[in-house]
Regions:
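N-terminal amphipathic/basic leader segments beginning at the initiator methionine
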Residues: 1-57, 61
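Short coil/turn connectors at secondary-structure junctions
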Residues: 37-40, 62-63, 78-85, 118-122
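Short, ordered loop/turn segments at secondary-structure junctions
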Residues: 48, 91-93, 128-130
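Glycine-rich oxoanion-binding loops at beta->alpha junctions
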Residues: 50-79
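Short acidic, glycine/serine/threonine-rich loops at helix termini
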Residues: 55, 98-101, 134-140
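Alpha-helical support elements that line or immediately flank enzyme active sites
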Residues: 87-116
Length: 151
């Protein structure tokens, strides 16, 4: 598919990810990346849990955050649910990490749900960065509360 065949105009939206009323977001340096000047963790939280949907890869070999977020939205065929927060890290993709990566993604949902005050299934997780390295869960234990305080 060639994107040039579509007549789509993309416009920047003032306010970024929090342009929609009722959403807060914070980005911090949590330590996923070595450079302390680079933000590497973000938390997006609606004022109250809200309907959410996701579109995910159909690749059988998808990363742990994709598998966990898909499950939290009701599985591969449903793709929608109630969302109370989105946890995003950069510097480590948590991909090709097997059961350890899945456990980390699930524990990230647990940590975020305790901080936000919701069910773990209401948290989505996303990771980008180096593939094949184990993501340190202890970084989330400090990052999530710090980002929540910064909202």
């Amino acid at each position: 598919m060639n994107a040039e065949q579509f007549d789509i105009k993309i416009h920047a939206v003032e306010g970024g990810v929090t342009a929609a009323a009722g959403f807060k977001a914070a980005g911090i340096h949590a330590g996923f990346r070595k450079n302390p000047e680079r933000l590497d963790y973000a938390l997006v939280v609606p004022d109250k849990p809200c309907p959410g949907a996701g579109v995910f890869t159909t690749n059988r070999f998808c990363a742990a955050p994709v598998q966990v977020s898909r499950a939290n939205l009701g599985g591969a065929h449903k793709g929608c649910g109630v969302i109370a927060g989105v946890s995003v890290n950069s510097g480590n993709a948590n991909a090709a990490t097997g059961e350890t990566g899945l456990a980390c993604a699930r524990e990230t949902c647990n940590i975020a749900s305790q901080v936000i005050g919701c069910e773990p299934q209401q948290i989505l997780v996303a990771s980008t960065g180096v593939i094949g390295q184990i993501l340190p869960i202890d970084t989330f234990e400090t990052a999530v509360p710090a980002a929540y305080e910064a909202l």
